[in-house]
Amino acid sequence: MAKKNERIVETRLGRLTLPEERVLQFPRGLIGFGDQREFTLIQVREDSPFLVLQSLDNPSLGLLVADPYSFMTEYEVVIGEADRRLLGIDSREQATVLVTVTIPQGMPERTTLNLSGPIVVNNEARVGLQIPQTDSRYPAHYTPGMATPKKS
């Protein structure tokens, strides 16, 4: 049974007991999932760079995500003033940046990161936004290890 400040959440990874402080609010939802507003991050394995951004309302909705800086150093996320206000941050350094990951079944060598739609989370306020990027250097299907064009 869940304690007062805990939730029991069904996921594809099994049932989890989740403290309220692990709940992330996404006021605009995510692209394609605008009605999903509450998520949590679940570590896939201790030695893995991957997490699951799990919807708390839909057990079948869990997106594989990762810190893009684990795969590349040159990645500049632009966060507009309105988004910074909604997140409650003054600069990008106050937030965690994540990108969705696609690993085709049986073909891990074809893994791609979506650099054009990063997910930015203020861990302290527990608020997240998906913030589409307009910089064409950052594709929706970036293969880790592939060179990214430098800013001109």
UniProtKB/Swiss-Prot annotation:
The keyword Transmembrane helix does not apply. GO terms for cellular component: cytoplasm. It comes from the Bacteria. GO terms for biological process: bacterial-type flagellum assembly; regulation of translation. It holds the Pfam family FliW. InterPro entries: Flagellar_assembly_factor_FliW (IPR003775), Flagellar_assmbl_FliW_dom_sf (IPR024046). The keyword Chaperone applies. Keywords: Bacterial flagellum biogenesis, Chaperone, Cytoplasm, Translation regulation. This is Flagellar assembly factor FliW.
